[in-house]
Amino acid sequence: MLMPKRVKYRKPFSAPRIKGVAKRGATVSFGEYGLKALEPKWVTARQIEAARIVISRYAKKKGKMWTRVFPDKAITKHPAETRMGKGKGAPDHWVAVVKPGHILFEVEGLDLDTTKRAMRMASDKLPIKTKLVSRR
């Protein structure tokens, strides 16, 4: 599972909402095709990993894949059956804050049909609407 090795603060502030569109990471930089996010949302490390596994199965040895998102925000949670209060809960899982326009995954070395199939399957594992974009 993806998570940072070290963080400056274990329990970060939670942002009220995700504003605007992605300024960085909005173009296909490494591969030939990319999976672009169309709506703002938190994407968990498990969802990223599930999508990555699907794409890598389609790519096998003939293609190459890049993951362009990383879960660097800790989400805290109180244990079950705990009363309210008593401070902030312990870090539970990690999420990546995804803005519209951000490229999530990139692939190269695959034909268009295989790429479409792989990206469609990966997009089903994610909680956001996405579209396939090409470098050209």
Curated annotation (Swiss-Prot):
It comes from the Bacteria. GO terms for molecular function: rRNA binding; structural constituent of ribosome; tRNA binding. Binds 23S rRNA and is also seen to make contacts with the A and possibly P site tRNAs. The keyword Ribosomal protein applies. Disulfide bonds: none annotated. PANTHER family: 50S/60S RIBOSOMAL PROTEIN L16, LARGE RIBOSOMAL SUBUNIT PROTEIN UL16M. The gene is rplP. One of its GO terms (biological process) is translation. GO terms for cellular component: cytosolic large ribosomal subunit. Belongs to the universal ribosomal protein uL16 family. This is Large ribosomal subunit protein uL16.
